[in-house]
Amino acid sequence: MWSEHVTLEYPYHFEEVLKRLSFDPLNVIQLDEKVIYVPLCIDEEQIVVRLQGIGTVQNPQFWISSQTGDPEKVMKRMRAIFHWNEPFQDIQNHFLNTSLRPLFETYAYTPIILEFDHFACLLRCIIHQQINLKFATVLTEQFVKRYGTEKNGVFFFPTPEIVANISIEELREQKFSQRKAEYIVGLGRSIASGTLNLASIETKAEEEVSAQLLPIRGIGTWTVQNFLMFGLGRKNMFPKADIGIQRAVQGVFQLDDKPDDAFLEKVKQECEPYCSYAALYLWKSIE
């Protein structure tokens, strides 16, 4: 077993992180102890990492421990997932001078948390397309518990190779639509065959990521934007077509009707170069 202690030099709202992550029944969280167990797959090894917050918003500190895994590689991934690589003060100061200031006062120093796995991020995006959040959450949980693996009470998403071999009929029996079942299996096959290499696009420009993902059935602009935001941690994404974003903007600005594209574009420009944080806090405002 190994463990590491991390102290951040800037404010960080870990309680808000755990609160949002607790909406997903697949996440193993102990809110009272400020603990989450993170499933990581590094070099084809499944690793359960225990993360505990032991500090405050103004003085954030963490204990990270695991029974397995290369500590250096695990810590590199944990820093990326939980946004420990970049101070928030510049982001916070930027939004305190925008029309979204009230949101950034309410949810101050809440980071964007990445999906624990790139393939899982794309799978989740496809499952969540065009259905309500509650049903999407149920479908995702059932899917992972049926095809994924469990280690120490923590569930790991299935690998692309496993998903590639699921039959469409089997997914249809689990209330997936015909088209969505085809998208899920097709994505697994694209990665398993080497047609799509998710590791290779981590550092590529947004246009290059889009060029590789959009030809795959079931992946459109909304999915690419969400993957860039929650899979790769890009800071300047603002999915204007997202219904939740539209509802949130309508509420924040007290509009009679949903905002049109011109209004959303104006909000987006005001938020640059940190649009992803605006999107996150807008979503939080309607949770």
Cite the ranges covered by each PLM segment.
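HhH-family (HhH-GPD) DNA N-glycosylase catalytic core used in base-excision repair
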Residues: M1-E287
